[in-house]
A protein has these predicted regions:
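ASCE P-loop NTPase motor core, strongest for the SF2 helicase catalytic module
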Residues: 1-170
Length: 170
């Protein structure tokens, strides 16, 4: 029997609140914290998750849970939504990639097709690519940077406009 455990990150506490209700309804044990959680209580929650294998889910806000903690008890990371700064999502996923991790880690990004999520993901990839180029860790990228940025901004604007139009016809 596999004993997979997961970290679920969202940048919205309202999403985490909904997930809490869903997990409680399903009878799934969980722990979690957000930026509102007392700093002293955070390590207690991390220790509880780490030491109790009957708790399969740790719910965390992306920014509060993305830095300075070791959560190798989990081997799944779910990014429920994306941060506009891809480094915050990268920091969040890195919670599982630490010394002591004994299982392969799987990262899942929830992206809704045809929504602004796709555009945010494209922008995030572009930002990470540029960061790699600046740090010398990536090969030269084909194409005009200004044109790519303009294309992404145009896709985001089109997506927002389509959503506004859809709502106005309802």
């Amino acid at each position: 029997e596999r004993r997979d455990r997961m970290l679920v990150f969202s940048q919205f506490t309202s999403v985490l609140d909904i997930l809490c209700v869903c997990l409680e309804h399903m009878g799934v044990k969980y722990v979690g914290f957000t930026g509102q959680t007392n700093v002293g209580d955070r390590q207690v929650l991390v220790d509880k998750f780490t030491s109790d294998p009957t708790i399969p889910v740790f719910l965390l806000s992306t920014r509060a849970g993305g830095l300075g903690i070791n959560l190798v008890a989990a081997n799944w990371v779910v990014l429920f939504d994306q941060d506009f700064n891809p480094q915050n999502d990268k920091q969040a996923t890195d919670r599982c990639y630490r010394i002591g991790q004994t299982k392969p880690v799987t990262v899942v990004r929830l992206i809704s097709r045809g929504t602004i999520d796709e555009d945010i993901l494209a922008l995030a990839h572009r930002k990470l690519e540029l960061a790699d180029r600046v740090s010398g860790q990536a090969a030269e990228v084909e194409g005009d940077e200004e044109q790519m940025e303009s294309d992404i901004k145009g896709r985001i604007a089109s997506s927002l406009l389509a959503q506004v139009r859809e709502r106005s016809t309802q």
